[in-house]
């Protein structure tokens, strides 16, 4: 089959202007947190967890003095498995911000803890970070002498 050079030049010129195909842009996968929620719901379903009503808020106290505060919290529990799930959006706050809200909820047995907390806030130090606090806890531990039994030490 003979090739006509004029037609070939015309086709080549036309093909330069047209772009067939192109670079493929891969679709970005959208990872949703709903997958985690469905896994959690399935796990709680296997444990036969039931929704617990009447809990309006929850507070988790951290060692550094901060508090994870859940204003609106959903609670599900499976008492036979000793498993409870708290769901919601936490806010990290200082203990001092939450004291007015926590005071009415505490009973008389917690007044001593509140006094200690107030002293810590006024003093501006944390007893766990203080080396003297660790030494005070070790005073109750007896020293063992070589050759003595643990039960014999008083």
Curated annotation (Swiss-Prot):
It is found in: Cytoplasm; Nucleus. Residues 125-154 are annotated as: Disordered. GO terms for cellular component: cytoplasm; nucleus. Residues 34-99 form the NAC-A/B domain. Its main location: cytoplasm. Pfam families: NAC. Belongs to the NAC-beta family. Component of the nascent polypeptide-associated complex (NAC), a dynamic component of the ribosomal exit tunnel, protecting the emerging polypeptides from interaction with other cytoplasmic proteins to ensure appropriate nascent protein targeting. The NAC complex also promotes mitochondrial protein import by enhancing productive ribosome interactions with the outer mitochondrial membrane and blocks the inappropriate interaction of ribosomes translating non-secretory nascent polypeptides with translocation sites in the membrane of the endoplasmic reticulum. This is Nascent polypeptide-associated complex subunit beta. It comes from Debaryomyces hansenii (strain ATCC 36239 / CBS 767 / BCRC 21394 / JCM 1990 / NBRC 0083 / IGC 2968).
